[in-house]
Amino acid sequence: MNIKIYTIIKIYLLLIFFFQYRKLANFILINKTLSKSQIFQDLICLHLLNYKKRGTFVEIGGGNGVDLSNTHLLEKKYNWKGVICEPDKRSQKKILKNRFAKLEVKPITNKCGKQIYFYEEEDPYLSSIKKGKNKINSYKLKTICLNHLISKYKIGNIIDYISIDTEGNEFEILKKFNFKKYNVNFFTIEHNFNLVKRKKIKQIMKKNKFKQVYKFLSYMDDWYINTNIK
């Protein structure tokens, strides 16, 4: 889905959402031009975490780090630090140019050190480890799992926000994640209307004491807040 369509969706959802969640809606209205996210994931994160400054993030499937980024605003205005994971070589140059976050180029899966193919699509935002209809290039890369990624970049055991948007293997990433070792405050996870995957994600998040929030607004995502967050 292109950026123009997302803009229309954002405006439509915002108008309806305003009447149900006034405080959050006001925050979005004031800051909507600063948001780079598809559907205000960055603003939702800030609102739920009390507009925290100097937080930490992991963005898995970061695109070019600017357009449709869930962490650009967090880094630039709120001084957050973290890691952007993006295997697409076309996007990596822009991340290195425009972001302070560390860049991980290996695909994130449920296994470390496995050689797999990564497929570039015409639209870089659709590139993934799963072969799509409009593949224009492919190359082999070694994988890394989320647990090792966090350890590699010394992010710490408390992580404020993890965004997962990998065009298909979101559940596989989560099922091997050490929820007991790492205390995450907020997740945004793309399901892209795959009901089977969505159900599996919901089960694993509920099992690990996460509560789904703002179902109406999350559209192609599901958003989960740690139940320990007040």
Locations of regions flagged by a protein language model:
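Phosphate/nucleotide-binding beta-alpha loop and adjacent structural elements of enzyme active sites
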Residues: N2-K230
